[in-house]
Amino acid sequence: MNKNELVSAVAEKAGLTKSDAASAVDAVFDVVQAELKNKGDIRLAGFGSFTVSHRAATKGRNPSTGAEVDIPARNVPKFTPGKGLKDAVNG
C-alpha cells in the first residue's frame, strides 16, 4: 500500500473526503517525524512504538576497492510492533 492508497482507505473508513484524509495522514506523519527528530518516543497501545535508536560509528569496506571507509554515527528510526498488531497479523 502506498500513501495514496492509505489516504483512500482512511477516507473510506472514516467517512472523510480524500482531501481531509490526506491532511490527517500528512499531520500524523509530520507529528511522528517531529517527535522522533527531537529524540522522543511515540507509544500507541496495542499498535506499537516508534523510537530513535543510536548507531555507533564503525569501519566498513568499499566492496569494489576493498578500501576501508568510516561510517559515521547516526540516529535511526525504529518501529516495534505491539501485541495487538502482532495478534492481528497472525490471527
UniProtKB/Swiss-Prot annotation:
Record-level GO BP terms: chromosome condensation
Annotated region described as Disordered, given as residue ranges: 57-91
Database matches in InterPro entries: Hist_DNA-bd, Histone-like_DNA-bd_CS, IHF-like_DNA-bd_dom_sf
Cross-referenced SUPFAM superfamilies: IHF-like DNA-binding proteins
Keyword DNA-binding belongs to the record: yes
The keyword Transmembrane helix appears for this protein: no
Keywords: DNA condensation, DNA-binding
Gene Ontology MF term list: DNA binding; structural constituent of chromatin
Protein family per UniProt: Belongs to the bacterial histone-like protein family.
Function as written in the Swiss-Prot or TrEMBL entry: Histone-like DNA-binding protein which is capable of wrapping DNA to stabilize it, and thus to prevent its denaturation under extreme environmental conditions. Binds to nod promoters and induces DNA binding.
Name the UniProt record assigns to this protein: DNA-binding protein HRL53
